[in-house]
UniProtKB/Swiss-Prot annotation:
Compartments where found: Cytoplasm
GO cellular component terms, semicolon-separated: cytosol
Keywords: Cytoplasm, Protein biosynthesis
Family per record: Belongs to the RRF family.
Record-given protein name: Ribosome-recycling factor
Gene Ontology MF, one: ribosomal large subunit binding
Gene Ontology BP, a term: cytoplasmic translational termination
Transmembrane segments: none
Amino acid sequence: MINQIDIKTRERMEACIQTFHNNITNIKTGRASPTLLHNIYIEYFGSKTPLRQVSNIIVEDSHTLKINVFDDSITSLIRKSILNSNLDLNPVLQGKDIIIPIPRLTEERRKQLIKVIRGDAESSRIQIRNIRRDANDKVKRLLKDKIISEDNEHTSQSKIQIMTNEYIKKIDCILEKKEKELMKF
């Protein structure tokens, strides 16, 4: 029973870390990266299709992305989707390809982005703590229902706390890495 709680807790914390990582990966750092466009979808044959399924996204240089579109008829749709994505990118049509210059970040914009990612990190830490609280509540219920002993409860809560500390450290590491990446350019 306690093992199930530990497994579920670890899965939920891992999902939280993954969500945080995915969210801050999409924050542009002034450097060209195909992941910048991973959340771009276009309307293709009546369904929303990820951009990476209908094109190749290539890094031309550190400040330029090039999109090789498989179907020329959707080039303008892709351009429109990028413009509407709130990524502050200005795609330029060049034949059947789309060129996306990545603007350099200003110092002010870097500071804004750092505030945003720190806020995301704090939200993720709160989620981790809430997961810990839920797991501890389940353990306490098991004790109350006399399914486990007090020793087992303390051991389980210690494991959950160690797990919590581990995942909060992971959040801090991801945050620190992204902050360094933002300040580098």
